[in-house]
Amino acid sequence: MACRSGCCCNSIGSFNEDNARFLMLALLIIIYLLCGAAVFSALEQPKEKLAKERWAQRIEQFTNKYNLSQDDLKNFLRNYEEANVAGIRVDATRARWDFAGAFYFVGTVVSTIGFGMTTPVTIAGKIFLIFYGLIGCAATILFFNLFLERVITVIAFVLKFCHERRESRKAGPTQNCRRPSTDNRDRRTDSLAGWKPSVYCVMLILGVAAILVSCCASAMYSAAEGWDYLDALYFCFVAFSTIGFGDMVSNQREIYEAQVAYRVGNFLFILTGVCCIYSLFNVISIVIKQVLNWLLRRLETPCHCPGRGNRHPRRNAVVPGHMRSRRENSIETDAVNDSEADGRRMSGEMISMKDFLAANKVNLAIMQKQLSEMANGHPRQSGSSSRHNEFSGGVGALGIMNNRLAETSVDR
């Protein structure tokens, strides 16, 4: 096929990089869902069939023993199902809608766990839940993001401190006694100042923290609820990851030993566990994004069509290596423009929302940070922050972790 309009290559380079990454992730998620469905179907379907057969046998035996029709028995069982939805159990349970029970319910709402053991049944309650959840879930997500920002900052500070101690020990006593040259001292200072922890170290630390919290919480639930330890560990993951099936729910019995202490421990463990797992999920998402970037680089094919080299690639496009110098020049120009804009803002001009929304990937966390810096009189640095990599302009938690880890740094 002849080249039309200068190029006819159907390579990955003609796509926007973010769109290519999004489509590849969507495809991988679909494949992941299909594989998961196959595994769970193979594991759980035989058990489901066996349970249905046993239930049919029990109904038949019960109707024959007490001379009842199956229709009457099924109607009675439907009434029990309705009572079960309302929170009524054969064994006595705690009140669902007293203040303590309602507090537990709203906690599962705003944290998006949603166990399902308690649901509003009145029209007024359902309408109120819509507006209450809209604000509460948004505020809780913001809380999780702020927690993530702080825990990443603390971990990065500790790891950097350990790295500096290790580097100072490597220098040795002989080098410490000698007066180092100015160039070597400046070079070493710049190297330490630009060091950032690896995402894998952060992921390992968060993983260990999540495991410790889950194991301690499982021990408490196993003792208080009478669950097997493995079932308690399963409940912790379902609750902390906000999956919230509702097949196992803590703090539902009417009476517990040391009831006040158990309720406080239950609240603290769920709060801490959700924060840890949320942070761990977001760090794992960086690793997944790295894999996607690696796959995109593997799929890059250079374009040899005549006249293609005269075109300027779009920003964020996956382009061959010999064309990236032009994109770097464009980025430097953007840095100068950003610097001029910062100068105008610092000179007392009003902050224009158009300046923030000019970029097509401004998220809430970055916008809040920029507004705070402008209000406090601290302009954002335009030299390095204007540079782009695969993680620049991330949304939500990715935006918070941008340039905080080695893998998300613009200097890597």
Swiss-Prot record:
Subcellular location: Cell membrane
Binding site for K(+) 3: 114, 244-245
Biased composition (Polar residues): 374-386
Record's keyword terms, sorted: Cell membrane, Ion channel, Ion transport, Membrane, Metal-binding, Potassium, Potassium channel, Potassium transport, Transmembrane, Transmembrane helix, Transport, Voltage-gated channel
Catalytic activities: K(+)(in) = K(+)(out)
Bilayer disposition of the protein: Multi-pass membrane protein
Activity control note: The channel conductance is activated by arachidonic acid and inhibited by Ba(2+) ions, volatile anesthetics such as halothane and antiarrhythmic drug mexiletine. Insensitive to extracellular pH change.
GO biological process: potassium ion transmembrane transport; regulation of excitatory synapse pruning; regulation of NLRP3 inflammasome complex assembly; regulation of resting membrane potential
Intramembrane extents: 97-117, 229-249
Sites where the protein binds K(+) 2: 113-114, 243-244
InterPro entries to which the protein is assigned, alphabetical: 2pore_dom_K_chnl, 2pore_dom_K_chnl_THIK, K_chnl_dom
Region of interest called Disordered, as start-end residue ranges on this chain: 374-395
Subunit record text: Homodimer. Heterodimer.
Assigned protein family: Belongs to the two pore domain potassium channel (TC 1.A.1.8) family.
UniProt-recorded name of the protein: Potassium channel, subfamily K, member 13
Gene responsible for this protein: kcnk13b
